[in-house]
Amino acid sequence: MASKGPSASASTENSNAGGPSGSSNGTGESGGQDSTFECNICLDTAKDAVISLCGHLFCWPCLHQWLETRPNRQVCPVCKAGISRDKVIPLYGRGSTGQQDPREKTPPRPQGQRPEPENRGGFQGFGFGDGGFQMSFGIGAFPFGIFATAFNINDGRPPPAVPGTPQYVDEQFLSRLFLFVALVIMFWLLIA
């Protein structure tokens, strides 16, 4: 019993050596002014700290951005429990400048801007979706395009080009080129 006395007094002296916060490095659990909380998203000191119902601490700007980027599936970034704006609790402590709810001052969302696509005339090559190029596949005696009807892409044909335009000239060139290739293949099959 007597041997426990000196060690107990030594530990009391060590805990009081850090000053009024109760810790020598300022990060103790005693709740000193130097103690900080870390956000579980940015891993920095939590600014406008909020705590989820599952017990995880976040900066409100970080959590707000997390929730805005996943509007259909709002889960806790740590444990994947359900989370929303209403399921977080603002955390106030010593040294906080204002007692305003951090959920009320959400960062402003930037306005979406959609520039109009530039209209490029003429044949754009074989880039799918770029120049209106479309392929239709058929099997044997069914050239109407089984794949096109199965995937519901058969109605996306652009109107025919107006004669005299560069697009019309390109289409005629490709038509003649494919006809020539088909004739060469048929001739090769006949002589083989």
From Swiss-Prot:
Cytoplasmic topological domain residue ranges: 1-130
Q: Which residues lie on this side of the membrane: Mitochondrial intermembrane?
A: 152-171
Q: Where in the cell is it found?
A: Mitochondrion outer membrane; Endoplasmic reticulum membrane
**Organism of origin:** Mus musculus
Q: Where is the composition biased (Polar residues)?
A: 1-13
Q: Hey, what tissues is this thing expressed in?
A: Ubiquitously expressed with high expression in testis.
SUPFAM superfamilies, A to Z: RING/U-box (SSF57850)
Q: Which pathway is this protein engaged in?
A: Protein modification; protein ubiquitination
User: Which UniProt keyword terms apply here?
Assistant: Autophagy, Endoplasmic reticulum, Immunity, Innate immunity, Membrane, Metal-binding, Mitochondrion, Mitochondrion outer membrane, Transferase, Transmembrane, Transmembrane helix, Ubl conjugation pathway, Zinc, Zinc-finger
Q: Which domain of life is it from?
A: Eukaryota
Residue ranges annotated as zinc fingers (RING-type) are 39-80
Note down the stretches annotated as region Disordered: 1-30, 90-123
UniProt name for this protein: E3 ubiquitin-protein ligase RNF185
What Pfam families does the database record attribute to this sequence? zf-C3HC4
Provide the function of this protein: E3 ubiquitin-protein ligase that regulates selective mitochondrial autophagy by mediating 'Lys-63'-linked polyubiquitination of BNIP1. Acts in the endoplasmic reticulum (ER)-associated degradation (ERAD) pathway, which targets misfolded proteins that accumulate in the endoplasmic reticulum (ER) for ubiquitination and subsequent proteasome-mediated degradation. Protects cells from ER stress-induced apoptosis. Responsible for the cotranslational ubiquitination and degradation of CFTR in the ERAD pathway.
Transmembrane ranges, per UniProt, are 131-151, 172-192
Q: Where is the composition biased (Low complexity)?
A: 14-27
Q: Which GO terms describe its cellular component?
A: endoplasmic reticulum; endoplasmic reticulum membrane; mitochondrial outer membrane
Per the entry's comment, what about the domains?
A: The RING-type zinc finger domain is responsible for E3 ubiquitin ligase activity.
* EC number of this enzyme: 2.3.2.27
Task: Return one GO MF term.
Answer: ubiquitin-like protein conjugating enzyme binding
Which class of enzymes does this protein belong to?
A: transferase
Gene3D superfamilies in UniProt: Zinc/RING finger domain, C3HC4 (zinc finger)
Query: What reaction does this enzyme carry out catalytically?
Result: S-ubiquitinyl-[E2 ubiquitin-conjugating enzyme]-L-cysteine + [acceptor protein]-L-lysine = [E2 ubiquitin-conjugating enzyme]-L-cysteine + N(6)-ubiquitinyl-[acceptor protein]-L-lysine
